[in-house]
């Protein structure tokens, strides 16, 4: 687990930022008329995905450590996972700021790229677990 320590620490550091995002959303909603209903929807989606995926990352590192992957492959898998988390949740925030109702935007594209990165990272983990001695 020592080899993955930096990734674990980064996830734990990122978690309070997601918590602060929830506080920020609540403050904006309570002020009223700051965000449109469209913006609130996409802010919530980005916030929820960031929180859930960050918690998933902590499990991911635990299981990745049980594989027989080399340290380089483990770090590559972690980097792919983190990039996927940032793109998946960040795309929702970008869509909130730049998108329009019922239309795709650059945020939508980034969210899809994030989902693909997450699938790649999870597929690597599954492969590593299946082939572990």
Q: Model regions: which residues?
A:
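Polytopic transmembrane helical bundles with strong interfacial aromatic enrichment
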Residues: 1-133
């Amino acid at each position: 687990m020592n080899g993955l320590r930096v990734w674990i620490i980064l996830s734990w550091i990122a978690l309070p930022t997601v918590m602060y995002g929830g506080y920020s959303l609540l403050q904006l909603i309570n002020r009223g008329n700051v965000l449109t209903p469209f913006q609130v929807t996409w802010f919530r989606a980005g916030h929820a995905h960031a929180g859930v995926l960050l918690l998933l990352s902590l499990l991911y590192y635990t299981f990745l450590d049980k594989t027989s992957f080399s340290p380089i492959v483990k770090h590559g898998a972690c980097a792919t996972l983190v990039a996927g988390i940032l793109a998946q949740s960040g795309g929702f925030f970008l869509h909130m700021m730049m998108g329009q109702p019922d239309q795709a935007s650059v945020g939508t594209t980034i969210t899809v790229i994030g989902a693909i990165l997450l699938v790649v990272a999870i597929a690597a983990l599954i492969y590593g677990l299946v082939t572990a001695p």
